[in-house]
């Protein structure tokens, strides 16, 4: 670049910083915040699948899945982990269904948890925006997008049609929220439900509620599914769960994690430690016996899990070794984040192009009908 152009650029950058504040424009290579702060999901396998050791602060996250798949349980686990780090969390309960006893059983400090049970979707998202703008709240959870009912729908008659009202509400709210989320470094988690698209012959008929805006604005999207029942004898004591990282702008996407959710207790951390320890040769398995550092820790998985519960120091040591082995180093992670963001931008551009083509096709069909 010539000296004159460099001087003009420096002058423009200086003017932008004076007018809009320091950090309003910078060179991407100078930005060291790509090594993003994160909070654990409560599942070691999922933390590893996410690539940065958990869910990222300063981003929008969407967790979706069928009913009773563990969506709210996972967000409560995130709150419990964040509170251990001294973070402030808020729960916007649009479904009016949060159980404080269950939350406490999962390790949530209910005395410190902020909770709101709004009457309308507009109120819920306005509360969410105010909490984010305060800069004093680290995690805001909205449960769920499907329950964010627009005011016009609540005040209207039961049979009234309100086409696209919720999608417009979400689109407007996310436009307001995203810049504030980045500035305040707040994580905003939206829980979402699944619906079926009518008349889909090929491809996946499933979709999430609230339109397409959340899909584009989310840095991380998690698809959580119940894959089976966990039994002790004839009694069902929990779920086998699979989580797929459908979208990830901070690390490579499409990784999966499998873990167990125990009723009344949450994610089985000890079960994951044993499974991952065996997989990566840190825990030895000979027949039914499990050994760690040459010492037998139990016969059968259930007894080995109990041993780790009774010996938290050994469990923490094993977890530390697994995290050190499987989580990428900061320099590598910075490169991965850039690559992941480029890939996510391409995917978003493809999705937008498809949506534009569909709209254009529908418009042409309408024109043909009107001409005929």
From Swiss-Prot:
Region of interest (Disordered), residue spans: 329-372
Domain of life of the native organism: Bacteria
Keywords for this protein: ATP-binding, Cytoplasm, DNA damage, DNA recombination, DNA repair, DNA-binding, Nucleotide-binding, SOS response
One GO BP: DNA recombination
Family: Belongs to the RecA family.
Subcellular localization, as worded in the UniProt entry: Cytoplasm
InterPro entries: AAA+_ATPase, DNA_recomb/repair_RecA, DNA_recomb/repair_RecA_CS, P-loop_NTPase, RecA-like_C, RecA-like_N, RecA_ATP-bd, RecA_C_sf
SMART domains per the UniProt record, alphabetical: AAA (SM00382)
Name of protein: Protein RecA
Gene3D superfamilies the record matches: P-loop containing nucleotide triphosphate hydrolases (3.40.50.300)
